[in-house]
């Protein structure tokens, strides 16, 4: 789809990527930390194939900052296997809020929400170690809640504290994969907010103006 950008020949240390929906289309964008647009990819929805089509046009960076959209990790393994991943910490907190709500009612939920908020206070390796300890302490205190199951009236069985379990597993998996604190070793940004608040907002404004 036109217009298109020329080939990217420079290898960048950090690249921010995100997807934005415009009507029935999805636009995937890759930019540098100074918001230089490197490439974009139109698609019907976020998928491994769509992300791979974007990544294959750009030399693999040292770090990619992303929000973990559908298909992106498989595409990264395929096209940029050696690139380090930094999950956008803003989106991590938003995902936790969706699972736990703004005001969790249980002690377990409240404590896990506090651990999520503490991500923004991790500035050193020592801070990261202490944060990981908080996560382990939470598991020792409340981990059994994530395993409890309930049989419902229709005969189906599900996790009793499903939202709590999802919030816990989000932090657990990101911690295991070392996707939370990449910035401590590589000096990259922690979020894709510059991309969302800059270029993406500009696109939304233009689309609203022309009625797209």
PLM feature spans:
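RNase H-like nuclease fold core
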Residues: 1-82, 167, 171-174
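Conserved beta-strand -> loop -> alpha-helix junction used to position metal-binding or nucleic-acid-contacting
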Residues: 18, 67-116
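Glycine-rich, often proline-containing surface loops adjacent to acidic residues and nearby aromatics
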Residues: 36, 92-93, 200
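Alpha-helix boundary/capping residues
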Residues: 58, 103, 206-207
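Acidic/histidine-rich catalytic cores and adjacent linkers
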Residues: 63-69, 73, 113-212
């Amino acid at each position: 789809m036109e217009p298109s950008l020329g080939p990217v020949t420079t290898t960048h240390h950090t690249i921010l990527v995100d997807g934005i929906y415009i009507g029935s289309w999805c636009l995937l964008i890759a930019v540098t930390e100074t918001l230089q647009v490197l490439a974009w990819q139109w698609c019907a929805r976020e998928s491994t194939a769509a992300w791979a089509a974007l990544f294959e046009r750009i030399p693999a960076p040292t770090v990619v900052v992303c929000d973990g959209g559908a298909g992106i990790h498989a595409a990264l393994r395929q096209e940029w296997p050696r690139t380090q991943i930094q999950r956008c910490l803003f989106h991590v907190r938003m995902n936790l809020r969706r699972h736990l709500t703004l005001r969790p009612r249980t002690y377990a939920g409240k404590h896990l929400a506090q651990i999520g908020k503490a991500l923004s206070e991790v500035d050193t390796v020592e801070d990261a170690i202490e944060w990981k300890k908080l996560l382990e302490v939470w598991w020792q205190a409340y981990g059994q809640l994530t395993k409890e199951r309930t049989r419902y009236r229709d005969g189906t069985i599900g996790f009793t504290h499903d939202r709590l379990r999802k919030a816990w597993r989000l932090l657990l998996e990101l911690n295991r994969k070392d996707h939370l604190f990449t910035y401590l070793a590589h000096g990259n940004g922690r979020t894709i907010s510059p991309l969302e608040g800059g270029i993406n907002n500009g696109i939304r404004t233009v689309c609203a103006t022309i009625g797209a």
